[in-house]
Structure formats: C-alpha cells, structure tokens
Amino acid sequence: MPSELSQRVVERLNELVDEETKRKFGELNIVTEVSEMATGSIRVSFRPLSAYSPLAVDTGRRIKQAALSVNGVLAVRVECSGHMMDDLVNRLVNEDEAGPKPLK
C-alpha cells in the first residue's frame, strides 16, 4: 500500500501539464510509479510520450521540482524509462544528487 506521502506526491504530479499536448500528466499516465524509499525520500518513475522526446529532461526536472514542493518530501530520485537515451536523461535530471563539481 502506498504511503500517505507518496499519495500526496502522485496527486501533485497528476496536476502537472505536459508542454507538448497541454494535457495533465494524470490523463496521460506519464508517471508510472511513485514510492517512498525512506522517510521523506521519494522515487518517481516516468515514461515520456515518445522514445525520442526532446523534452524528456525538462519533464523529469519538472517532476522532481513538483515532488520536492510537497510538504514532507526531503529528496527525490527521478527515473526515466522508455526513452532512447534513458541513461543520459536520468543523469541530467538527477545530477545535483552528486553534489557540487570540483573546480579545475
């Protein structure tokens, strides 16, 4: 059974509007899974509308920011699947988790 926090995150994400179609994420089933990994730590899986979507990184970042805006959420990990460049999308969306980059 999903936690109360993950349910609130789902409700928030379902209200986001897709930039390409102008329809809500909840209508499009873009978000495929939301789970609470630890207290305040949320993992969100999503599938872009197209395997070649140029907006996959932007969509992932919007999902992350929206999830972080929910009271009680301390950290968010976003995972993209179904995109031609899943690994790159995931790295770019979650790059701030690695901490600041050292200066050269």
Where are these regions (language model features)?
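Domain-level signature for proteins that mediate thiol-based redox and metal-cofactor handling
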Residues: 1-104
